Amino acid sequence: MNSENLIRRYVITGSRRLSNYWWASVVFLGAIGFLFTGLSSYFGQNLLPFLQVQNITFFPQGLVMSFYGILGLLLSIYLWLTIIWNVGGGFNEFNKKAGAIRIFRWGFPGKTRCIDISYSLKEVEAIKVDFKQGVNPQRTLYLRVKGKREIPLSQIGQPLTVEEVEKQAAELAKFLQVSVEGL
C-alpha cells in the first residue's frame, strides 16, 4: 500500500461560501442605503445624488431608517468577520500511517478558536448516516467513537443527495474498515 492510500483528508468549507459573500454584501449595501437616507432626512440634503429626501421627515421615518441602517451595518460586520475568520472551516484527516483521526475546525476568536480533536483508529466503532426529511432536510455523516458521542463529519450548507452521502459513508467505512450504520 503506498502513502497516498494511507491518508485521507476532507476539507470542510466553513463560512467562506459564495452565499455568505452574497448576503454579507447585500446586507451591507442595504444598510448603507438606509443609513444615508436617514442622515439625509436629518440634514435636509441629499447625501447621495439619486436620493430624494424632501418628503421624508426625520422624526419618525428618518430616525427609524437610521436605526435600521446601523443594525444592518452591525449584522454586515458580523457576517464579514465570520467569513474572514473562516468559522466552521477545517478538515477531517484519517491517517492509517499514524493510526490516528484528526478533526480540525476554526471557531470564533478566544480560548476555543481552534477545535482540534484526535482519536486513535482503534477507537472508531462505526460511521453513522443520519437522514432527516422535511422542510430543511439534513443528511449528516457521524464518526462513532467508543465510549464517546458521535462526531459530525459533514459540512453545513447545501445538503448532499442521498446517493452522495451513501457513497461517502461507504468509502470512509471501507478505508477505516468499520461498519456503516443508519442506511
UniProtKB/Swiss-Prot annotation:
Record-level GO cellular component terms: chloroplast thylakoid membrane; photosystem I
Main location: plastid
Topological relation to the membrane, as annotated: Multi-pass membrane protein
Record function comment: Seems to be required for the assembly of the photosystem I complex.
Transmembrane segments: 23-43, 64-84
UniProt-listed HAMAP family: Ycf4
UniProt cross-references to PANTHER family, sorted A to Z: PHOTOSYSTEM I ASSEMBLY PROTEIN YCF4, PTHR33288
One Pfam family this sequence matches: Ycf4
Locations listed in the record: Plastid, Chloroplast thylakoid membrane
NCBIfam families membership: PRK02542.1
Keyword list, A-Z: Chloroplast, Membrane, Photosynthesis, Plastid, Thylakoid, Transmembrane, Transmembrane helix
Span of the signal peptide: none
Record protein name field: Photosystem I assembly protein Ycf4
Family statement drawn from the similarity comment of this UniProt entry: Belongs to the Ycf4 family.
GO process annotations (BP): photosynthesis
